[in-house]
């Protein structure tokens, strides 16, 4: 447990390091902390903080820098979120960009772009899981034994699937099949449709049964190229010296963007929590790079969490500025998707 003097000095050190990017010495701490302490007293407190693992001393400097553990204590107990940006202006920008009535995937992609533009780091969004409940389906004949299945979800998302059939179907037969499914099964999951079809198989002609079973099977298969993590503004991080000054670190960063596995895991974890979360590199096992942090928040559709969004940036980021950007964007994305 830190005493008030140590807390003030640690908070001042981290704020100055975030602002300047340079190790912070006792003279700077004396100037900005508001405490009337001698340089010797400040150095003693810094030594205590170093023993606690909250700050460290770079070999090339007499000053100190925060450790991941120090950042964690700072964001959990010392951070005052007073955004220097105009939150009303942010709200207007997000509302202008996230247009209700647009396809869901386009709205979600726009959110990633908004996060990137506002933070000047990288914006990331875990897209909503595909709905296995449908509002309407339609069959479109493409050629002999090839049919396009068009699925409209209750959220307004449109999904397409290819079906290879054992026989050719006339357009009138496809219309008959889609009308039957929409009339009897709309609003159900495809698993429930499969169960109902087994019960009603005697009432259907054999050709219609085969087509409907093919549609249900295709509907429950996720396409291989489905994007689950959308990233915008990766190039912004090339301007961040903390991440780009080391080639091996930069290569690892873009491997993270390319593979997306670790990001998917992190965003999935944060989707099970309420509100903004901060994952700090070197402190969280979910962040693969020590110099990287991720600020996330879940978003909802009609009160149900369906995904997560966030900002990826350096550990040395202005958290008090990024947190409200993420929070406002998540709230307005939730509102936009719920109005679809």
UniProtKB/Swiss-Prot annotation:
Instruction: Establish whether keyword Nucleotide-binding is in the entry.
Output: no
One GO BP on record is: negative regulation of DNA-templated transcription
Q: Which SUPFAM superfamilies match?
A: GAF domain-like (SSF55781), Winged helix' DNA-binding domain (SSF46785)
The record's keywords, sorted A to Z, are: Repressor, Stress response, Transcription, Transcription regulation
Q: What single Pfam family name could you report for this chain, choosing any that match?
A: HrcA
What Gene Ontology molecular function terms does this protein carry?
A: DNA binding
Family according to the record = Belongs to the HrcA family.
Question: What is the recorded function of this protein according to its Swiss-Prot or TrEMBL entry?
Answer: Negative regulator of class I heat shock genes (grpE-dnaK-dnaJ and groELS operons). Prevents heat-shock induction of these operons.
PANTHER family, per database record: HEAT-INDUCIBLE TRANSCRIPTION REPRESSOR HRCA (PTHR34824:SF1)
**What name appears for this protein in its UniProt entry?**
Heat-inducible transcription repressor HrcA
Recorded source organism is: Burkholderia mallei (strain ATCC 23344)
Its taxonomic path starts at: Bacteria, Pseudomonadati, Pseudomonadota, Betaproteobacteria, Burkholderiales
Report which gene this protein is encoded by: hrcA
């Amino acid at each position: 447990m830190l005493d008030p003097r140590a807390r003030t000095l640690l908070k001042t050190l981290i704020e100055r390091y975030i602002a300047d990017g340079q190790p912070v010495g006792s003279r700077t701490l004396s100037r900005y902390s508001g405490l009337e302490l001698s340089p010797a007293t400040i150095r003693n407190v810094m030594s205590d903080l170093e023993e606690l693992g909250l700050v460290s001393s770079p070999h090339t400097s007499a000053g100190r820098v925060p450790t991941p553990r120090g950042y964690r204590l700072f964001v959990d107990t010392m951070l005052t979120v007073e955004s220097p940006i105009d939150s009303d202006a942010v709200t207007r920008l997000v509302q202008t960009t996230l247009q209700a009535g647009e396809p869901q995937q386009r709205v979600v992609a726009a959110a990633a772009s908004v996060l990137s533009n506002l933070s000047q780091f990288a914006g990331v969004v875990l897209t909503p899981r595909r709905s296995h409940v449908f509002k309407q389906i339609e069959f479109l004949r493409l050629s002999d034994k090839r049919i396009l299945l068009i699925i409209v979800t209750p959220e307004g998302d449109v999904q397409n699937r290819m079906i290879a059939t054992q026989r050719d179907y006339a357009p009138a037969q496809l219309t008959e099949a889609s009308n039957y499914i929409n009339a009897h099964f709309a609003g159900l999951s495809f698993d429930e449709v499969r169960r109902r079809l087994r019960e009603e198989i005697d009432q259907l002609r054999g050709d219609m049964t085969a087509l409907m079973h093919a549609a249900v099977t295709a509907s429950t298969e996720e396409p291989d190229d489905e994007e689950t993590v959308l990233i915008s503004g990766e190039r912004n991080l090339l301007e961040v010296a903390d991440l780009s000054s080391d080639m091996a670190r930069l290569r690892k960063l873009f491997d993270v963007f390319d593979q997306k596995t670790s990001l998917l895991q992190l965003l999935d974890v944060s989707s099970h929590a309420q509100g903004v979360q901060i994952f700090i590199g070197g402190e969280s096992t979910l962040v693969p790079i020590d110099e990287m942090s991720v600020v996330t928040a879940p978003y909802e559709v009609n009160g149900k969490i369906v995904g997560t969004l966030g900002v990826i940036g350096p550990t040395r980021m202005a958290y008090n500025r990024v947190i409200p950007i993420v929070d406002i964007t998540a709230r307005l994305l939730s509102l936009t998707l719920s109005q679809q």
